[in-house]
Curated annotation (Swiss-Prot):
This is Uroporphyrinogen decarboxylase. PANTHER family: METHYLTETRAHYDROFOLATE:HOMOCYSTEINE METHYLTRANSFERASE RELATED, UROPORPHYRINOGEN DECARBOXYLASE. Keywords: Cytoplasm, Decarboxylase, Lyase, Porphyrin biosynthesis. The record marks 71 as: Transition state stabilizer. Homodimer. The gene is hemE. The keyword Lyase applies. It is an enzyme of class 4 (lyase). InterPro entries: UROD/MetE-like_sf (IPR038071), Uroporphyrinogen_deCO2ase_HemE (IPR006361), Uroporphyrinogen_deCOase (IPR000257).
Length: 340
């Protein structure tokens, strides 16, 4: 195995650490800022407040990377689509159903994303130079599912029925979102992000044929476009829940880093790390348990991934009820772990 130059730098031989949703509700300092803003989208566009909460986990835990505080649904919102977040419910969107809806999307974009790029610039200015800054977007497929369902966390029968019955319109919508995603990610890089992540939260709901069309192909297009402008920018992909199709994804998508969910065996991570940097994959629920369990699980991952191309992370976002002291303990376990 050839060790790949780590996209997130450290001066020692310990794996870099950052956590998905590391700026979030488990932190009291985050909640204090959140209470000052009326709604979640307003929070995402508030340059000072979004910068502050992006930096909070860096100041508290010393993570090796910051990820911009934002949301994957700022993209459809910036296309003029109706998006709202309801407390204890989650995202609610106007449901995409027709060619008329597609025409509306094409004609009603706004400049809301400029605030996101201002946030990236401000964070980069205030972040330690040694700390990486991750910009991100949702994958075209995952963003599509929210628009087709009108909300999150469904069984996705509406989305799947739509792409089976409306192949041409589904392809048009996918391509449109793909192009807008490319522009959004490139603008984040221009603003100071030095790593990009593509979150495909609902990749795992598709059969193989549709997985190739709606997950693999648009992701390849995004990466090719970004690399055309910024060949040295590392790109993290996350086809969450893809199971056996992770391997097909890795065969076809020229990703720099593959984020792994908790259901993928560690031995698979170890094998894949011979060709690509892997990131993951501690079950977020582990951080709700005790220090003995946390330490055992972390040490198991570290022992298997020793001397591999590896970034430590969770297999999904940190849970709101996570005790911050358990996150502190996680960082301590990784930093103090002695490799054999």
């Amino acid at each position: 195995m050839t060790l790949i130059s780590s996209p997130i730098k450290r001066l020692d031989n310990k794996p870099p650490i950052w956590l998905m949703r590391q700026a979030g509700r488990y932190l009291s300092e985050y909640m204090a800022v959140r209470k000052e803003v009326k709604n979640f989208l307003e929070f995402c566009y508030d340059v000072d407040k979004a910068t502050e909460v992006t930096l909070q986990p860096i100041k508290r835990f010393g993570f090796d990377a910051a990820i911009i505080f934002s949301d994957i649904l700022v993209l459809p919102h910036a296309l003029g689509w109706e998006v709202d977040f309801k407390e204890n419910i989650g995202p609610l969107l106007k449901q995409f159903k027709s060619k008329e809806d597609f025409k509306y999307l094409q004609d009603n974009s706004n400049d809301k994303l400029e605030k996101v790029y201002e946030i990236v610039k401000k964070v980069r200015k205030e972040l330690p130079k040694s700390t990486s800054l991750i910009g991100f977007a949702g994958s075209p497929w995952t963003v599509m599912t929210y628009m087709l369902e009108g909300k999150g966390k469904q069984d996705f029968r509406v989305s799947k029925k739509f792409i089976y019955e409306n192949k041409d319109l589904a392809k048009e919508l996918l391509n449109f979102i793909t192009e807008k995603t490319i522009h959004h990610l490139i603008n984040q890089i221009k603003s100071g992000a030095n790593i990009i992540k593509i979150f495909d939260s609902w990749a795992g709901i598709l059969p193989e044929e549709e997985f190739k069309k709606f997950v693999i192909e648009p992701t390849k297009k995004i990466i090719k476009s970004i690399k055309g402008y910024f060949p040295d920018i590392p790109i993290i992909t996350f086809p969450k829940g893809a199971g056996l199709l992770y391997e097909k994804f890795l065969e076809e998508v020229p990703t720099d880093i593959i984020a792994i969910d908790p259901l993928i065996p560690l031995e698979k991570m170890k094998l894949w790390s011979n060709k690509v940097t892997v990131q993951g994959n501690l079950d977020p629920v582990i951080l709700l348990t005790n220090k003995k369990i946390i330490k055992e699980k972390i040490h198991k991952i570290l022992s298997i991934m020793e001397n591999k191309n590896f970034i430590f992370n969770l297999g999904h976002g940190i849970l709101p009820e996570t005790p911050p002291e358990n996150v502190e303990f996680l960082v301590k376990c990784i930093r103090e772990y002695e490799y054999k």
